[in-house]
């Protein structure tokens, strides 16, 4: 096994031979015949297609996307959202009922449940305008994209981080991570910017102004590892236990 992902009530694993194994609740990704799609069309089962040739899996809310070595995307699970009928993808990401296929030419294709994501031509146009998108992440009701020029594009619920990014997110960003309520971005100068509901880092702005080398998150908090070995955590402003700095 080279990768394993949770599906709420099930799990999906990718093996080194390119096969996929699932177990758990049948409707949340375990049964690969449930809401199964191949080449943009509904199929009875993906069992044979998942025996080999898979190079990446991505999953959210009981939905699974599997990227094959031929560039096609297979999908199955709880929501049953139809992926594009093309075979020129090199990466795939699933987040909050929305799906993003990264194509070989650098463009991004989106699909998912209407009203809960970027499944529209206007948002897809924004993602494909300007610099190439390197990464997309999702909070509970918002999304953020990191672009090749170090800028960040965000959309969705403003209280969950979907508001327009501030000027300090227009360049220099090298990583973004989500939690359920917002996002945090690591900049090339070692500083951190966070935004969205419950992700206010003003209380520790001095600790996060430099020296951060890695960001992590759980469902409601963020953690920053600093170059001196210390850790700074923050999150929902009502959760005072998450406002700490731990020395090395």
Outline where the language-model segments fall.
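Short, exposed beta-strand/loop patches in secreted or surface proteins that constitute
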Residues: 3, 12-13, 47-48, 55, ...
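Short glycine/serine- and acidic-residue-enriched loop/turn motifs that recur at repeat junctions
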Residues: 23-50, 76-86, 109-128, 155-169, ...
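A generic structural signal for ordered secondary structure
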Residues: 25, 57, 62, 67, ...
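Conserved core positions of repeat-based scaffolds
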Residues: 10-13, 22, 63-66, 75, ...
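Short loop/turn segments immediately following the C-termini of beta-strands
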Residues: 9, 16, 25, 62, ...
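Tandem repeat domain/solenoid detector
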Residues: 2-3, 16-19, 52-56, 69-72, ...
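Low-complexity/repetitive intrinsically disordered segments
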Residues: 1-5, 14, 232-234, 247-248
């Amino acid at each position: 096994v080279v990768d394993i992902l949770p599906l709420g009530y099930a799990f999906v694993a990718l093996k080194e031979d390119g096969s996929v194994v699932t177990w758990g609740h049948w409707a949340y990704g375990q049964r690969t015949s449930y809401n199964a799609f191949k080449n943009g069309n509904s199929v009875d089962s993906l069992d044979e297609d998942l025996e080999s040739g898979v190079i990446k899996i991505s999953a959210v809310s009981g939905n699974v996307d599997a990227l094959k070595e031929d560039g096609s995307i297979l999908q199955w699970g709880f929501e049953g959202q139809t992926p594009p009928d093309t075979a020129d993808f090199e990466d795939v990401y699933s987040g909050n009922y929305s799906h993003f296929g990264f194509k070989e030419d650098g463009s991004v294709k989106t699909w998912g449940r209407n009203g809960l994501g970027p499944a529209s031509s206007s948002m897809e146009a924004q993602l494909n305008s300007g610099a190439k998108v390197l990464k997309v992440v999702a909070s509970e009701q918002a999304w953020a994209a990191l672009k090749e020029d170090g800028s960040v594009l965000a959309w969705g619920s403003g209280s969950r981080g979907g508001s327009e990014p501030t000027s300090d997110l227009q360049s220099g960003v090298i990583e973004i991570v989500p939690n359920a309520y917002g996002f945090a971005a690591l900049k090339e100068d070692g500083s951190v910017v966070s935004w969205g509901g419950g992700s206010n880092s003003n209380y520790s702005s001095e600790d996060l102004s430099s020296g951060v080398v890695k960001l992590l998150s759980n469902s409601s908090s963020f953690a920053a590892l600093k170059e001196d070995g210390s850790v700074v955590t923050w999150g929902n402003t009502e959760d005072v236990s998450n406002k700490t700095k731990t020395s090395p």
